[in-house]
Amino acid sequence: MLQENNNCVIDTEMRDIMGKSVYIAEKPSVAQEFAKALHVNFTRKDGYLEGGDHIVTWCVGHLVTMSYPDAYDPNLKRWSFDTLPFIPKEFKYEVIPAVAKQFNIVKDILTRDDVEYIYVCTDSGREGEYIYRLVRQEAGVKGKKERRVWIDSQTEEEILKGINTAKDISEYDNLSDSAYLRAKEDYLMGINFSRAVSYTHLRAHETKANL
């Protein structure tokens, strides 16, 4: 079934077969543009919009982050050269406390039984991919048909084109892998160098104080 909106055509056949479709954006303002482009009578709810077979929700930038060393071992909260370099065998992640409410809203939506399709509408790039993949990981999304919307602008025509041509999320696994790798590199460099430099300055200050 083709739906025409202001000279733009959107294929709604897939979404009409069974369950609902979720469109998850990187920020509220972008989510609003997607909602406008869909021309659906949405009802505003806490952290999302819903109308008919469509749900539009959003992140607020990053909702999930990499855990600090003390999440691996409480003893690592105390800085010491003896614990450097810190290189975990497996990396841990956690929901950012300040945005936990929105994460839980998004998690509940993505894992709803009546949701069949998830259209990933985070920014088209490595960081946008990473933002969604972390949410997907921590929310435990399984059994959904995930499609990646890749657009160059937020015009209605571009949004509808992006939805119609959305590819399976697996097409972007390499991009996701590179995002995870870059984040791990930044994390290891940041944690180890900041601790080493800070601890060095602390020891130097203590030495001067004792002279």
What are these regions (language model features)?
Residues L2-R203, L211:
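Toprim catalytic domain recognition across nucleic-acid enzymes
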